[in-house]
Amino acid sequence: MIENKLKIARVTNGNLTQAEVAEKVGCSRQTINSIENNKFVPSVELALRIAQLLHVRIEDIFFLT
């Protein structure tokens, strides 16, 4: 299972809303919400876009449990 710390990274690296992250990475706010709640696993491309936007390594946000 893949879990994430997206909400923590989103708030600490720019205090961005779900909608702001979604707009900047090219997906819906609902997608970001689903990722944060571990209901959806993002594609590698989307995960990389999120990490780049938040200036963190992908493995700092997404990890296997």
Where are these regions (language model features)?
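DNA major-groove recognition helix of helix-turn-helix/homeodomain DNA-binding modules
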Residues: E45-D60
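DNA major-groove recognition helix of helix-turn-helix
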Residues: R10, E36, L54
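Recognition helix of helix-turn-helix/homeodomain-like DNA-binding domains
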Residues: C27-V41
